UniProtKB/Swiss-Prot annotation:
Enzyme Commission code(s) on record: 6.1.1.20
The species this protein was found in: Exiguobacterium sibiricum (strain DSM 17290 / CCUG 55495 / CIP 109462 / JCM 13490 / 255-15)
UniProt subunit comment: Tetramer of two alpha and two beta subunits.
Binding annotation for Mg(2+): 255
Protein name (Swiss-Prot/TrEMBL): Phenylalanine--tRNA ligase alpha subunit
GO cellular component: cytoplasm
Main location: cytoplasm
Similarity comment: Belongs to the class-II aminoacyl-tRNA synthetase family. Phe-tRNA synthetase alpha subunit type 1 subfamily.
Swiss-Prot/TrEMBL keywords: Aminoacyl-tRNA synthetase, ATP-binding, Cytoplasm, Ligase, Magnesium, Metal-binding, Nucleotide-binding, Protein biosynthesis
Cofactor: Mg(2+)
The keyword Metal-binding is assigned to this record: yes
Cofactor notes: Binds 2 magnesium ions per tetramer.
Subcellular location: Cytoplasm
Classification via InterPro entries: aa-tRNA-synth_II, aa-tRNA-synth_II/BPL/LPL, Phe-tRNA-synth_IIc_asu, Phe-tRNA_ligase_II_N, Phe_tRNA_ligase_alpha1_bac, Phenylalanyl-tRNA_Synthase, tRNA-bd_arm
Length: 340
């Protein structure tokens, strides 16, 4: 019996050493140590042995079982390590290879310019005001001194939904709403947003574009305050070397009204193709709030005055970044957008 058990031990240990996978090791364990294995059979048959043989055979069988189990466990550790080494070698990454950069999204140029304009005016004490894009005729026209027969109300110029509802043509309705809600108190607001007009799309016009308007109402507000505000804005937006000039103009909601020009970025005022040899580039319209507008918003025009200004965000972006076609902003061409 001793020789038989030792032969089983040697046979099992040989197979253990030859095994190269966890499955092969498990097969050896089942074959020799399983419920139907030869060593288990020996232990089960000990009842047939004499009293003198039983302890001797039991000791030998348990020793053989222990040796095989120990070798299986040790070999299993080695096989697992070998399998891991092989897997790592197969999946090895060369850390010296150049990485693959991931494209990261960013704010659209119009959003960047809007944020910059807002930051400038918030720094001057303004608050941001917003309103609906689908607007009442009352706020879009009537409260801005644009009576029913005014040319700007022509159906060809505006997107009307009903006789009294339209897509706003400017962000001025936000000013009217804010003045009404302020109940005669001083205000200083900036109104950015989308506006809509019945324009043919071309290099400089779009049926939808972005506008930002500013409004200040208070006691003893003067044209000098307007000029100083716009000078501060232009220098922060376009550089300290820029100057502005005011030209007389007409807007129904301001009196007096002005067009505001900035000294040319390219030639510094000497004259070039960008400024059409004038040395100046038009950037926005402005003026003192018309007394009728103040009165319709329930302000006392004998005590309160104010100024307003408005500019196209696309135009500011085109001038600052040298964009030659407004349609570039809306074509979703990554080659254009990623430049900014």
């Amino acid at each position: 019996m001793r020789e038989q058990l030792e032969a089983l031990r040697d046979e099992a240990l040989q197979l253990v050493n030859q095994a190269s996978t966890q499955k092969e090791l498990n097969d050896v364990r089942v074959k020799y140590l399983g419920k139907k294995g030869p060593i288990t059979e020996v232990l089960r048959g000990m009842g047939k042995l004499s009293a003198e043989e039983r302890p001797v055979v039991g000791e030998i069988a348990n020793a053989v079982r222990s040796v095989i189990q120990t070798e299986l466990e040790q070999r299993l550790v080695d096989v697992k390590q070998q399998e891991m080494d092989a897997k790592l070698a197969l999946e090895a990454i060369d850390v010296t290879l150049p990485g693959r950069p991931k494209q990261v999204g960013q704010a659209h140029l119009l959003q960047q310019v809007t944020d910059e304009i807002e930051d400038i005016f918030v720094g001057l004490g303004y608050t941001i005001a917003e309103g609906p894009e689908v607007e009442q005729d009352l706020f879009n026209f009537e409260m801005l001194n644009l009576p029913k027969d005014h040319p700007a109300r022509d159906m060809q110029d505006s997107f009307y939904i009903t006789d009294e509802i339209l897509m706003r043509t400017h962000t001025s309705p936000v000013q009217a709403r804010t003045m009404l809600a302020s109940k005669g108190e001083p205000i200083r607001i900036l109104c950015p947003g989308k506006v809509y007009r019945r324009d043919e799309d071309d290099a400089t016009h779009s049926h939808q574009f972005m506008q930002v308007e500013g409004l200040v109402v208070g006691e003893e507000i003067s044209m000098a305050d307007l000029k100083g505000t716009l000078e501060a804005f232009v220098k922060q937006m376009f550089g300290e070397a820029r100057e502005i000039r005011l030209r007389p103009s007409f807007f129904p909601f301001t009196e007096p009204s002005v067009e505001v020009d900035v000294s040319c970025f390219k030639c510094g005022g000497k004259g070039c193709n960008i400024c059409k040899q004038t040395g100046w580039i038009e950037i926005l319209g402005a003026g003192m709030v018309h007394p009728h507008v103040l009165e319709m918003a329930e302000y006392d025009s004998t005590k309160m005055s104010g100024f307003a200004f408005g500019m196209g965000i696309e135009r500011i972006a085109m001038l600052k970044y040298g964009v030659d076609d407004i349609r570039h902003f809306y074509t979703n061409d990554v080659r254009f957008s990623e430049q900014f």
